[in-house]
Amino acid sequence: MTTDVTHVTAGVTTFFQGEHQSHPLFRIEPGIPCQDAREQASELMGYVRELTIVGLMDEKPMMIWASHYLSAMAKALMDDAELGMRG
């Protein structure tokens, strides 16, 4: 599969802003092909799904929190890829 490198991440989306969403701790890197970013987001969401199920079924809240943070990463990847695809 060929990757369209004309559309790349913008590098402006932050995630996990810390207490009260006031401190950007992580940012998506600019210049990543949007297709790659979207594929990685999909992979992360698969992990989110599995961790959520394990956390609920086994009553392990740490798994739920892990899935929460991974979903924030996946959302940031998708949001930044969307910005990159818009131009």
What feature does the model see in each segment?
Residues M1-G87:
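Sequence/structural signature of long amphipathic alpha-helices
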